[in-house]
Amino acid sequence: MEKQLIVTYYHHSGFSVASGDILLVFDYWLGEHQELPQDKQITPETLKKYSKTYVFISHEHPDHMDPVVFTWREVADVTYIVSGDMPVGTRGRRMNAGDTLTLSDRLTVQAYPSTDLGVSFLAEVDGFRVFHAGDLNF
């Protein structure tokens, strides 16, 4: 069977990539006024479809990290990968530009500089490469 990725755009800079039973979620945000439609939101039922979820937070701005992501670990196996500029006490594996993390035999992540705060991420999952630029300031 041919491998495939399922990419879902949410809002602002947020999107997810599913590869088999792994879900990668980048800069998830419901919106300043919760404008992400209910039918597009990641729910506990969504998370339970995957054996592992990785949540990436590129930097500390509120529009790149909805607090709801920190409740997901109550219902699913979630690992957080966060920029080194996140406040002390933020849950997760911290990454600065130049860092590489091997999170499983199926997922490796490299952090690169951003044109604004934080980092950008290059994730290699199941042989596919996915780049998330983080915040763009140009």
Regions found by a protein language model. Give the residues of each.
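Residues that mark the start of a beta-strand
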Residues: I6, I22-L23, T108, G127-R129
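Active-site beta-strand termini and strand-to-loop segments that position acidic
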Residues: V17-G20, L103-S104, A123-D126
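Pre-active-site segment of Zn-dependent metallo-hydrolases
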Residues: S16-F56, P67-T71, L136-F138
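N-terminal pre-catalytic "stem/leader" segment of glycosyltransferase-like enzymes
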Residues: M1-G20
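Active-site-proximal loop/helix segments of hydrolase catalytic cores
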Residues: S114-F138
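A metal-dependent hydrolase metal-coordination microenvironment
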Residues: Y10, A97-F121
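Active-site HxH/HxHxD metal-binding segment of metal-dependent hydrolases
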Residues: Q41-T102
